[in-house]
């Protein structure tokens, strides 16, 4: 393999052109690499070519156009020979009989199998998809050729992907040192943060630890919220003051945890060991929050003696100011309300698609009895008095349940609204 070790990587094939693959392919192309972007969806490939993709990410369209115009990026439905292959496909969680979940590696394995005919001795294969420990080594064994394999997990936040692709530190774990060093040569072309080299098992575990830490912290905040509801304390005030301590950093509670990372990744640790009971408990607590919110809604409607209520949900995406609805707590809240035969209209200024019908603001609130805020979009934070007055006219009852603590409560109260805040037992 000596002759290949001296070969400079010039051509890269990126498999999967979603939230991570498309920005990564575009970034590499803009930094001089010949990039083949591959997605099995012909519809998606055509959308990308036309700049008509459904990813709401600042700067991405400009970056993509620059990559395509430079002739360094070509998007296709099939891979071809290259010096390096980067796999950026989803790794969702699938349910198990015991109520837990585990990683669905089918997309990763399909991606690996799709590039097998094009892999030559000395090529580099990088897995960016989040995977359980020991998976990178298994992929190397599947390839069964003298190649280099590394894991470089993505660590970006939707809405800030391009900024964080460049500025964030990266971790690269190889099946051997040479694999990690080869991958580092690629990423240092655009990464301004530090790049840490380790083995593949450690890199896999680091990514899972990062998101598990946040999931557990949110679970703690959610448990505090439930306790504060019970004992008459405002959890938001309590957390704010507790965080004044220099060694305390409690995150905010909310209606649950969604997205393709934090709500999924802890299960990849749980599936590997029986010693992850605390991690599993936190994950299950967060998964139950949408049902806690549903019970809050029903309780407040009963307190107002509202028969046959209609509910309006503000926010379908899993977090604020993105269009991504994957694993959104909003869906679970609406599911739970539907089981109680409570009709729901959903308004979201960012979501492009959702399991339930999306309505305009005006249509969603007509004759509604309750507005439930489930996502912290800027549009919800910045309602002006005139807009609130117009909303008020269309409602049947003026009840708001704010699970994100983002509304200007004084403005809404002046318009006659009753506001119930998640975790505020003091109201």
From Swiss-Prot:
Cited InterPro entries: 6-PGluconate_DH-like_C_sf, NAD(P)-bd_dom_sf, UDP-Glc/GDP-Man, UDP-Glc/GDP-Man_DH_C, UDP-Glc/GDP-Man_DH_C_sf, UDP-Glc/GDP-Man_DH_dimer, UDP-Glc/GDP-Man_DH_N, UDP_ManNAc/GlcNAc_DH
Enzyme class: oxidoreductase
Binding-site positions, NAD(+): 19-20, 39, 44, 91, 130, 326
Pfam families: UDPG_MGDP_dh (PF00984), UDPG_MGDP_dh_C (PF03720), UDPG_MGDP_dh_N (PF03721)
Enzyme Commission code(s) on record: 1.1.1.336
GO molecular function: NAD binding; oxidoreductase activity, acting on the CH-CH group of donors, NAD or NADP as acceptor; UDP-N-acetyl-D-mannosamine dehydrogenase activity
UniProt: UDP-N-acetyl-alpha-D-mannosaminouronate binding residues: 155-156, 207, 211, 214, 245, 247, 258, 318-319, 404
Origin superkingdom: Archaea
SMART domains: UDPG_MGDP_dh_C
Keyword list, A-Z: NAD, Oxidoreductase
GO biological process, one term: polysaccharide biosynthetic process
Catalysed transformations (reactions): UDP-N-acetyl-alpha-D-mannosamine + 2 NAD(+) + H2O = UDP-N-acetyl-alpha-D-mannosaminouronate + 2 NADH + 3 H(+)
Active-site residues (renumbered): 207 (proton donor/acceptor), 261 (nucleophile)
Function: Catalyzes the four-electron oxidation of UDP-N-acetyl-D-mannosamine (UDP-ManNAc), reducing NAD(+) and releasing UDP-N-acetylmannosaminuronic acid (UDP-ManNAcA).
PANTHER family for this protein: UDP-N-ACETYL-D-MANNOSAMINE DEHYDROGENASE
Family stated for the protein in its record: Belongs to the UDP-glucose/GDP-mannose dehydrogenase family.
Subunit and partners: Homotetramer; probably dimer of dimers.
Protein name (Swiss-Prot/TrEMBL): UDP-N-acetyl-D-mannosamine dehydrogenase
Organism: Methanococcus vannielii (strain ATCC 35089 / DSM 1224 / JCM 13029 / OCM 148 / SB)
Organism lineage string: Archaea, Methanobacteriati, Methanobacteriota, Methanomada group, Methanococci
Gene: wecC
């Amino acid at each position: 393999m000596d002759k290949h070790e001296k070969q400079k990587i010039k051509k890269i094939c990126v498999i999967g052109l979603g939230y991570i693959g498309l920005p990564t392919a575009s970034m590499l192309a803009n930094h001089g690499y010949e990039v083949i972007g591959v997605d099995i969806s012909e519809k998606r490939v055509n959308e990308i070519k036309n700049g008509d993709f459904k990813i709401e990410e600042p700067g991405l369209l400009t970056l993509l156009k620059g990559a395509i115009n430079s002739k360094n990026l070509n998007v296709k439905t099939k891979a071809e020979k290259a010096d390096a292959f980067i796999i950026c496909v989803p790794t969702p969680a699938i349910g198990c009989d015991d109520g837990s979940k585990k990683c669905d590696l089918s997309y990763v394995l399909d991606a690996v199998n799709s590039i097998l005919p094009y892999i030559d001795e000395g090529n580099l294969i990088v897995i960016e998809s989040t995977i359980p420990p020991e998976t990178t080594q298994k992929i190397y064994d599947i390839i069964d050729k003298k190649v280099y394999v590394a894991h470089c997990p993505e660590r970006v936040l939707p809405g800030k992907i391009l900024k964080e692709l460049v500025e964030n530190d990266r971790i690269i774990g190889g099946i051997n040192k040479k694999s990690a060093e080869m991958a580092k040569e690629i990423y240092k072309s655009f990464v301004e943060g530090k790049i840490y080299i380790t083995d593949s098992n450690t890199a896999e575990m680091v990514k899972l630890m990062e998101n598990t830490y946040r999931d557990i912290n949110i679970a703690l905040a959610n448990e505090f919220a439930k306790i504060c509801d019970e004992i008459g304390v405002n959890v938001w005030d309590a957390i704010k003051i507790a965080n004044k301590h220099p060694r305390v950093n409690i995150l905010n509670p909310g209606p649950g945890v969604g997205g393709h990372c934090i709500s999924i990744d802890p299960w990849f640790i749980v599936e590997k060991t029986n010693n992850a009971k605390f991690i599993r408990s936190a994950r299950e607590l967060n998964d139950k929050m949408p049902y806690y919110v549903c019970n809050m809604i029903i309780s407040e409607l009963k307190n107002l003696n509202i028969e046959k209520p209609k509910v309006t949900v503000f926010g379908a995406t899993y977090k604020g100011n993105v269009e991504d609805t994957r694993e959104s707590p909003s869906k679970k809240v609406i599911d739970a309300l539907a089981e109680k035969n409570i009709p729901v209209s959903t308004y979201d200024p960012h979501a492009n698609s959702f399991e339930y019908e999306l309505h305009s603001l005006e249509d969603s609130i007509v004759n509604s009895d309750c507005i439930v805020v489930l996502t912290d979009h800027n549009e919800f934070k910045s309602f002006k008095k005139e807009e609130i007055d117009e909303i008020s006219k269309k409602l049947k009852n003026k009840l708001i349940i704010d699970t994100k603590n983002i509304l200007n409560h004084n403005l809404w109260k002046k318009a006659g609204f009753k506001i119930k805040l998640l975790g505020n037992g003091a109201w």
